[in-house]
Swiss-Prot record:
Belongs to the methyltransferase superfamily. RsmH family. The lineage of its organism: Bacteria, Bacillati, Bacillota, Bacilli, Lactobacillales. NCBIfam families: 16S rRNA (cytosine(1402)-N(4))-methyltransferase RsmH (TIGR00006). Pfam families: Methyltransf_5. S-adenosyl-L-methionine binds at residues 33-35, 52, 84, 106, 113. Specifically methylates the N4 position of cytidine in position 1402 (C1402) of 16S rRNA. Keywords: Cytoplasm, Methyltransferase, rRNA processing, S-adenosyl-L-methionine, Transferase. This is Ribosomal RNA small subunit methyltransferase H. It is found in: Cytoplasm. It is an enzyme of class 2 (transferase). One of its GO terms (molecular function) is rRNA (cytosine-N4-)-methyltransferase activity. The keyword Transferase applies. InterPro entries: RsmH, SAM-dep_MeTrfase_MraW_recog, SAM-dependent_MTases_sf. It comes from Lactobacillus johnsonii (strain CNCM I-12250 / La1 / NCC 533).
Length: 315
């Protein structure tokens, strides 16, 4: 089975990295490798290090990028099976200690992960509740749904899914699991449908969409690891190096925007005649507003509708 995933904002993400021959670049979310392949095509010399916590994605990449993975005087591509929040320690293990020239993120779940029923990400297929991007971790969706308290469930659904019926759904989950465990995705869909009023189910897409998103974010601590990784990535960038981040959820975009703002602005104390050397900004924003998909891409790739790209450069 091929890892078929159409990359979003492909040219915008890589072109804004301003890649240079001989550079060292990190693909923090390798997936199907679409962005990496385009980046490698722009480099006569240079290396891309691809991170992915999904073992399936790594195994597929080893097949489709066999030529680029060949060990030579200067490898074109190196793969790391780990979460992108462990950037520094993995780079050190690879003997890289003098920084990187660029890094990019394509956040969220890839199409193949959604389309594999056994992964339990989608409400479209009946499968055991799972939703783990890293199959080796213990916490899964089944554990959250069947063991977390009603308040914890309600908070997750509201905070990560913007689900306005979070309390009703959490209450219904707790009531239902008292009768028997909620084992599969369809079990959970049935509970959610029962909890949401009929008038609300008739509009706004699938009634389980927001809840499934919220539980997935909680399972993988997506917002926590994103913040941790961005902070680390900015430190690892060499002066002139750039960071590109594609988000699909408002929660993700808020984190990226906040961190970019934190490192690109300086608060000057009142009365101070000049900016102290240690108070100068770390980043320069390449675009004040997020870059969105073109009209052509919106027609070709439905996934691009909610995509936002933010880019910054290390000073």
């Amino acid at each position: 089975m091929k890892f078929k995933h159409k990359s979003v904002l492909l040219h915008e993400t890589i072109d804004n990295l301003n890649p240079k021959d001989g550079g060292l670049y990190v693909d923090a979310t390798f997936g199907g490798g679409g962005h990496a392949r385009y980046l490698l095509s722009k480099l006569n010399k240079g290396t891309v290090i691809g991170f992915d916590q999904d073992e399936y994605a790594i195994s597929m990449a080893k097949e489709s990028f066999a030529k680029e993975l060949q060990v030579g005087a200067e490898p074109r591509l190196m793969l790391v099976h780990d979460n992108f929040c462990h950037l520094k320690e993995n780079l050190v293990e690879l003997g890289i200690s003098d920084g990187i020239d660029g890094i990019y993120y394509d956040l969220g779940v890839s199409s193949p992960q959604f389309d594999q029923p056994e992964r339990g990400f989608s409400y479209r297929f009946d499968a055991r509740l799972d939703m783990r991007m890293d199959q080796s971790q213990e916490l899964d969706a089944y554990t959250i749904v069947n063991t977390w308290s009603q308040k914890e469930l309600s908070d997750v659904l509201y905070k990560y899914g913007d689900e306005k019926f979070s309390r009703q759904i959490a209450r219904k989950i707790v009531d239902r699991r008292k009768e028997k465990p909620i084992v599969t995705t369809f079990d959970l869909v049935d509970v959610i449908k029962d909890a949401i009023p009929a008038y609300a189910r008739r509009s706004g897409g699938h009634p389980a969409k927001k809840s499934f998103q919220a539980i997935r974010v909680a399972v993988n601590d997506e917002l926590g690891v994103l913040q941790e990784s961005l902070e680390e990535a900015i430190k690892l960038l060499k002066p002139g190096g750039r960071i590109s981040v594609i988000t699909f959820q408002s929660h993700e975009d808020k984190i990226v925007k906040k961190i970019f703002k934190k490192y690109s602005e300086v608060e000057i104390p009142r009365g101070m005649p000049m900016v102290p050397a240690d108070s100068k900004p770390t980043l320069r924003l390449i675009s004040r507003k997020p870059i969105m998909a073109s009209s052509d891409e919106l027609e070709e790739n439905n996934r691009s509708h909610s995509a936002k790209l933010r880019v910054a450069e290390k000073l």
